[in-house]
């Protein structure tokens, strides 16, 4: 089987970036699994059309809470329709994973590879762990080319399910290199300004040369069959 599973990590993105990303995917008949960090009217309006899972942040500086219990309580209140989670910065441990299982989670996607195809597996808590094939930020951090290489195309066309991660801010801004987005985050003055960024500000920050959006758009065209985390989970249960 050769499926591409498209996932979107909100990471406190502003509504214009979320709308831009989800509209693009919808217009190309791609139904993503969205991992939410916060309330989004755009995502919530699409709850009947797309899968929505959770994106908790387990860290002392988390806006979700300062303890595992606080983070779990906060994140479980966010509207969602899939019992799955992916931790922000992949920051999880035995205690946090156990807490998410106790809260009803069935799917985890917290192993991020550098373009490796690894099949899903059950972990010690009974979660179905679904490894990530490619994450946009990690791809930029590794300084991979912004063109589809022959090697990447060969892997994409080969056997196995590949999970990719798109961040709305990376996609909408068309980030050309890792430091570009880092500098934006430093300049906007806090998470509140980041989350409430206007369309005009977002447009002013957009990179007009070749960037990660260009690569992702081409990547999505290479693999014709798209699936979702929910579809994958149901296929494993059969």
Residue ranges of model-derived segments:
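Glycine-rich phosphate-binding "P-loop"
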Residues: 2-9, 53-66
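Terminal accessory/targeting
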Residues: 1-49, 73, 77-81, 94-106, ...
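Core nucleotidyl-transferase/polymerase catalytic module
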Residues: 45, 64-70
């Amino acid at each position: 089987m050769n499926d591409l599973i498209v996932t979107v990590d909100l990471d406190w993105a502003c509504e214009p970036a979320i709308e831009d990303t989800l509209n693009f995917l919808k217009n190309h008949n791609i139904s993503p699994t969205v991992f939410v960090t916060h309330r989004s009217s755009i995502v919530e309006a699409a709850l009947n059309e797309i899968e929505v899972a959770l994106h908790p942040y387990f860290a002392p500086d988390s806006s979700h809470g300062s303890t595992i219990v606080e983070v779990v309580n906060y994140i479980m209140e966010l509207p969602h329709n899939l019992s799955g989670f992916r931790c922000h910065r992949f920051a999880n441990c035995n205690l946090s994973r156990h807490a998410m299982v106790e809260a009803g989670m069935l799917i985890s996607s917290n192993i991020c590879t550098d373009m490796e195809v690894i099949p899903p597996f059950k972990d010690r808590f009974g979660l179905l762990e679904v490894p990530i094939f490619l994450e946009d930020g990690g791809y930029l951090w590794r300084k991979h080319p912004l063109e589809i290489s022959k090697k990447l195309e060969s892997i994409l066309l080969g056997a196995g399910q590949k999970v990719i991660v798109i961040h709305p801010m990376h996609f909408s801004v068309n980030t050309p290199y890792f430091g570009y987005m880092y500098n934006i985050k430093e300049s906007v003055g806090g998470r509140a300004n980041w989350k409430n960024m206007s369309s005009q500000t977002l447009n002013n920050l957009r990179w007009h040369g070749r960037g990660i959006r260009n690569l992702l758009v081409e990547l999505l065209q290479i693999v014709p069959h798209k699936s979702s985390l929910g579809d994958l989970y149901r296929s494993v249960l059969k």
